[in-house]
A protein has these predicted regions:
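A structural signal for short, well-ordered beta-strand segments and their strand-loop junctions
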Residues: 30-33, 85-86, 122-123
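Short, hydrophobic/aromatic alpha-helical segments in well-folded domains
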Residues: 6, 19, 69-73, 130
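A structural signal for short, well-ordered beta-strand segments
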Residues: 33-36, 70-72, 143-147
Length: 210
């Protein structure tokens, strides 16, 4: 995001936010991470894992969950090209991969995440999942976007990582300000958020990357 505005709209994509509200149980959450994953031919296989630690809240009534992750398929996800496998219902157990005898082995309840390019799949950070081996001749690519409860630390502290020019760009529009709020950058004590803040020239090489 410090390079340009290409990803500015990702944290405020309405359907992703609605999914986060539904799973987390309210609006007290923020953007946790954004990353890409490319699985070249012959690679991409992972052991089953969750994206968060044990969750005793899953056993409460009603259950409590810490967040969501999502996959935007930049390539088709097929049976042959290493599509993600997910263990249906695992998020309700409160356990992680530590409960498995062999996280690398097939699981009887696993299902494949399949779809054409452009498909978005949203899932709990507590569900077991993993990439599988890409047996096709082309790289399989996707974007992961995650939202977590606000009391959980971010993968990258967005407020500290944002370059001055990124703050200035986001401050120009209502959507940009909304993006900053979801990213956890709405601290009124941050001098960069003042309307009269002057951006000092800063070489791109010194700007931290989000």
């Amino acid at each position: 995001m410090n390079d340009d505005g290409f990803f500015d709209a990702v944290p405020v994509q309405p359907k992703l936010l609605a999914a986060a509200v539904h799973v987390i149980g309210g609006s007290d959450f923020r953007w946790f991470s954004l990353n890409t994953r490319g699985s070249p031919p012959g690679l991409g296989e992972q052991a089953l894992h969750t994206d968060h630690g044990p969750n005793p809240g899953a056993l409460e009534t009603p259950p409590r969950y810490s967040g969501i992750n999502s996959v935007l398929m930049l390539s088709p996800f097929t049976e042959q090209n290493g599509s993600t496998r997910m263990v249906s219902g695992w998020h309700r157990t409160g356990d992680t991969q530590e409960a498995l005898a062999d996280p690398s082995a097939p699981h009887p309840d696993e299902q494949r995440m399949l779809g054409p390019a452009g498909t978005v799949v949203v899932f709990s950070v507590h569900i077991l999942h993993s990439g599988t081996r890409n047996d096709s001749e082309q790289t399989r690519s996707c974007i992961h976007t995650s939202f977590m409860r606000r009391d959980r630390p971010q993968q990258v502290n967005q407020r500290e990582a944002a370059a001055p020019q990124t703050i200035a760009r986001l401050m120009r529009t209502a959507k940009g300000r909304a993006t900053m709020a979801v990213m956890g950058m709405q601290d009124e004590d941050d001098p960069r958020l003042r309307d009269d803040y002057t951006i000092n020239d800063q070489p791109d090489s010194e700007a931290p990357r989000l």
